[in-house]
Amino acid sequence: MTSKPSGSVSWFQVFQRGQHYMKTWPSDKRLAPVFPENRVASATRFAVRFMPPLAVFTLTWQIALGGQLGPAIATALFACSMPMQGLWWLGRRSVTPLPPTLLQWFHEVRNKLAEAGQAVAPVEGTPTYQALADLLKRAFKQLDKTFLDDL
C-alpha cells in the first residue's frame, strides 16, 4: 500500500471491512492488470473454503501416524491463518486513501455516472479504495461495459 490508511479501526473491524470489500469489489478481468484485488479476493475465498478442512486433516494425519504434534499444530495454525491474512490485507486496503493517479480516474468514472443521469453522492473527504469499489460496482451495473475503454 502506498499511503497510510485513514482513521484507526479495531482489528475485528479490519476483518469485517475486508469481507465487505471482497464482496463489493467487481471481479472484472479488465481490472486485474491494474488492481491486485481480484487475485487476493479469489485466493482469500479459496482459503476460507479449503484451509480449515486442510488444517483438520493435517492434525488428524499427524496424530494418526504418531508424528510430532508441534509441527502439526504449526501447520494447522498456518493453514487457518491464510484466510485471515487475506481478509486483513483487504480490510487495510479498503480504508487506504486513493493515490493521485487513481483519484483522477475515480472522478472520471463519477463524471461518467453523472453524465449518464445517475445520482452521485458528494465525496466526503479523501476517497478510499472502498469508495472506488462501490463506484466501480455501480458503474458496472448501470453503465455499458465499454465505459472502461474510454478512460
Swiss-Prot record:
Q: List the disulfide bonds.
A: none
Q: Which InterPro entries match?
A: UPF0208 (IPR007334)
List localization entries.
Answer: Cell inner membrane
According to the UniProt record, one GO cellular component term is: plasma membrane
Read off the Pfam families from this record.
DUF412
Keywords of the record: Cell inner membrane, Cell membrane, Membrane, Transmembrane, Transmembrane helix
Transmembrane helix in keyword set: yes
Keyword Transmembrane helix (UniProt)? yes
Principal localisation: membrane
- Bilayer disposition of the protein: Multi-pass membrane protein
Q: What is this protein called?
A: UPF0208 membrane protein Spro_3315
